[in-house]
């Protein structure tokens, strides 16, 4: 998990992401009878690991996602579908970034690594198969302006061939999804203060509008 015209010109095509890694645990999803969930807001920060420069985003994180209630082999919620963020950097430059593919359906969300029943909190990761044509990376995060275009992607696939996993946590009570990722620069065009070797750390939260509840699946 976006409609970013500048990025689409660099990474053309819309392809459904695929996930095939076996989950560490299974989960059941419900959304209060809703068939889709929506992001209603949140915040995010993109930090240059070399310079410490931060790009702050707080004007809204949005997505619309279908819910497959009762699925137990990784929940395909597509939580990054139609995902974009409007941002402002330290110099007041307006930016928009998000994934460049427009479609990230069938992303396996919340492969579980832990569940805290008392807190209603699930920890796990988002797993995307990055081997499909025209999908060089998970979230090809894109920053664009009239002055420069940055395309960012995960620097490596640490957990399985052609896969990239983004750690995330979802808390039922606050309906908050928290995620983070390391990203590296792929296709810069003269961006002041940016080097081709720069890496970035992304962290953000998304508030889910519907009463989405994720629980361990019963055997």
Language-model segments: residues:
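Secretory targeting and sorting signals
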Residues: 1-19
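N-terminal segment immediately downstream of the Sec signal-peptide cleavage site
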Residues: 18-84, 182-219
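Intrinsic-disorder/low-complexity loop/linker signature
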Residues: 52, 92, 134, 162, ...
């Amino acid at each position: 998990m976006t409609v970013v015209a500048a990025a689409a010109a660099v990474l053309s095509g819309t392809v459904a992401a695929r996930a095939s890694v076996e989950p560490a645990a299974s989960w059941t999803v419900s959304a209060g009878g809703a068939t889709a969930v929506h992001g209603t807001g949140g915040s995010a920060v993109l930090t240059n690991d070399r310079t410490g420069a931060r790009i702050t985003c707080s004007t809204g994180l949005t997505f619309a996602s279908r819910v497959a209630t009762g699925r137990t082999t990784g929940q395909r919620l597509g939580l990054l579908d139609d995902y974009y963020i409007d941002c402002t950097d330290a110099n007041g430059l307006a930016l928009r970034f998000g994934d460049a593919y427009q479609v990230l359906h069938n992303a396996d969300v919340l492969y579980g690594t832990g569940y805290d029943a008392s807190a209603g909190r699930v920890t796990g990761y988002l797993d995307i198969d990055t081997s499909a044509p025209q999908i060089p990376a998970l979230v090809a995060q894109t920053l664009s302006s009239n002055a420069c275009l940055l395309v960012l992607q995960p620097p490596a696939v640490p957990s399985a061939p052609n896969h990239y996993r983004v750690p995330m946590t979802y808390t039922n009570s606050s309906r908050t999804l928290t995620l983070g990722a390391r990203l590296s620069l792929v296709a810069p065009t003269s961006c002041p203060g940016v080097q081709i070797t720069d890496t970035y750390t992304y962290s953000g939260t998304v508030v889910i509008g519907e009463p989405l509840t994720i629980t361990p699946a019963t055997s």
